[in-house]
From Swiss-Prot:
GO terms for biological process: succinyl-CoA metabolic process; tricarboxylic acid cycle. GO terms for molecular function: ATP binding; magnesium ion binding; succinate-CoA ligase (ADP-forming) activity; succinate-CoA ligase (GDP-forming) activity. One of its GO terms (cellular component) is succinate-CoA ligase complex. ATP binds at K46, G53, R54, G55, E99, T102, E107. Coiled coil: none annotated. Heterotetramer of two alpha and two beta subunits. Substrate binds at N264, G321, I322, V323. It catalyses: succinate + ATP + CoA = succinyl-CoA + ADP + phosphate; GTP + succinate + CoA = succinyl-CoA + GDP + phosphate. Its cofactor is Mg(2+). This is Succinate--CoA ligase [ADP-forming] subunit beta. It comes from Colwellia psychrerythraea (strain 34H / ATCC BAA-681) (Vibrio psychroerythus). Transmembrane segments: none annotated. Binds 1 Mg(2+) ion per subunit.
Length: 388
């Protein structure tokens, strides 16, 4: 689960990190009034969406009057912002963040992630702030400095100082950096973060460190014990199909291909997507119906897949271990009848009661294409999606 920038900065302030004074506003009038509360003669206005690249898309602007703030808010509130990180439809803008203007002498990067390889939280810092960390990692990885946090002792001030020396900070800035580092480490653990970025962490003209932006991702598996984080949830920023799938305990991720995939098991689902690609097709989604799939969930899975207008064919790939293939077959038949599937459906069943499942499909009287193997299924569904 991701947070908006204004929510991230609210947490930063609670943990004693230096952030700009700002207000998240729902209306143009409220945005203009926020400028009066902040004071000064120059402000920054930012659209609040769960995506990067806002500046290049026109979603961030430096303004010098309340009229400009109003115009910006009127232009964006209720509309969708399209960036390189969104799909073609973009993300809806429901809030505008109005902030005081901060002078910038230099831009740094500071972030943290859960590193699966070392099984630890790893902090990353770089002198190359203001650009994508992925780009830095690819082009100049030597400019990224890391500090692994030992889970037994937690973050230590000496680790912050080591990073600070590599960033070229002076003694005054070093003290500030240690405070920021320790605050972020505590916040990361307290709130069950999966990702944290301050990009950029700026050095002002006065030589002070300041958190100019904030990006936070919460570990979805920990939301149950984080009521405060759960309250930050903004469903408008999620794909409607993914949100609907979650209600049925279906793991669904929308993609941009034409072959809908319904599979039980995440590993098999990824393998199915790979083999569809191998045979010249493009998956329209990742969908894991799980080990406890029943007729109702299979039916909902079909509805979700077919709600994507790009889907030209559907591949159902089921390995019957916990779940019985004949039950899945009945679910497929019920779903096809209920939903009124108009695209070709290719089904491959293996495992518990696979023969019985195939027999059920064969006797259904529906136009369902049976596949003998995964390769056969991929070949048939790609051909069907291409209208062959």
């Amino acid at each position: 689960m991701n947070l908006h920038e204004y929510q991230a900065k609210q947490l930063f302030a609670e943990y004693g990190l230096p952030v700009s004074e700002g207000f998240a506003c729902d209306t143009p009038q409220e945005a203009a009034e926020a400028a009066d509360k902040i004071g000064g003669d120059m402000w920054v206005v930012k659209t609040q969406v769960h995506a990067g690249g806002r500046g290049k898309a026109g979603g961030v602007k430096l303004v010098k009057s309340k009229e400009e703030i109003k115009e910006f808010a009127q232009h964006w509130l209720g509309k969708n912002l399209v960036t390189y990180q969104t799909d073609a439809n973009g993300q809806p803008v429901a809030k505008i963040l109005v902030e005081s203007c901060t002078d910038i002498a230099n831009e740094l990067y500071l972030g943290a992630v859960v590193d699966r390889a070392s099984q630890r939280v790893v902090f990353m810092a770089s002198t190359e702030g203001g650009v994508d960390i992925e780009k830095i990692a690819e082009e100049t990885p030597e400019l990224i400095h890391q500090a692994e946090i030992d889970p037994l002792v937690g973050a230590q001030p000496y680790q912050a100082r080591e990073l600070g020396f590599k960033l070229g900070l002076n003694p005054t800035q070093m003290k500030q950096f240690v405070k920021i580092f320790m605050g972020l480490a505590k916040m990361f653990e307290d709130c069950d973060f999966a990702l944290l970025e301050i990009n950029p962490l700026v050095i002002t003209d006065e030589g002070n460190l300041h958190c100019l932006d904030g990006k936070i991702g919460i570990d979805g598996n920990a939301i149950y014990r984080q009521p405060k984080m759960r309250a930050f949830h903004d469903p408008s920023q999620e794909d409607e199909r993914e949100a609907h799938a979650a209600q049925w305990e279906l793991n669904y991720v929308a993609l941009d291909g034409t072959v809908g995939c319904m599979v039980n098991g995440a590993g098999l689902a990824m393998g199915t997507m790979d083999i569809v690609n191998l045979h010249g097709g493009k998956p329209a989604n990742f969908l894991d119906v799980g080990g406890g799939a029943n007729k109702e969930r299979v039916s909902e899975a079909f509805k979700i897949i077919l709600s994507d207008d790009n889907v030209k064919a559907v591949l159902v790939n089921i390995f019957g271990g916990i779940v019985r293939c004949d039950m899945i077959a009945e679910g497929i038949i019920g779903a096809v009848k209920e939903v009124g599937v108009k695209v070709p459906v290719v089904v491959r069943l293996e495992g518990t009661n696979a023969e019985l499942g195939r027999e059920v499909l064969k006797n259904s009287g529906l136009d369902i294409i049976a596949a003998e193997s995964l390769t056969d299924a991929a070949t048939k569904v790609v051909a069907a999606a291409e209208g062959k």
